[in-house]
């Protein structure tokens, strides 16, 4: 098999079960996924960093042997998550083509450095998932540690961020943070992980399509021959048939086009946006100056800065106006 090149294909699709549970389940899932002809890399969790002890924490080394068999069976590269230097050593011993650092590991610079040190000199693709908490510096720092270790085949995985309170998603995507990472590291492929963003099958297609619309470079999606009986994350995994249907539904658009009519229309609209932005900033500046004057008046009259009634009336007024102007109330 040729050495894996993460930039050789777009979109890059990585799929497989959340966990390698048994040899039969692993091989049959990988066989069916490969048969779709839409997947580029097979994945399976070998070591599972669970939130609470007592949950299934992976089968360990024998799972790597199963994945090696899956590679022989399908001809596809294999990948898995690592969390310690021992995991790295085992993955390299079995010739794993793609490894990734999980969200629970990215938050810890000591763990990331331990992995980076173990990877020195290795010719393997390394993907870095965003940290659990929305701290872009931790994400950037993990990339820097890998680069300092001489790792050149790097990529990013956006899997969403933990958020307190009720949410539509298991992990809030916070798309703006992933977009900021793309600005910082434009040369690195960005892969979306809708399985972990959603936490269920309901919104997988919607999130996957949005990532495609945002010019992501691929997807990593969990698939299992019998998702409802999976030993981990059952609700977010698709059957291989479901995976194929989802992948065929995604529309991957071009980043740009040389069409003269497109370029002219876009230039005209962008000029309008630039003008509107300038007007908005001018109005914001004027508002800030008025707000400063209000603050001085309150100070001179020994009145608190925040007055709840006034603030709520502003919020209510703006929210009520939003639908009339075609703006989301969110």
Residue ranges and their predicted role:
Residues 11-28, 52-57, 77-82, 102-104, ...:
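Active-site mouth loops of central-metabolism enzymes
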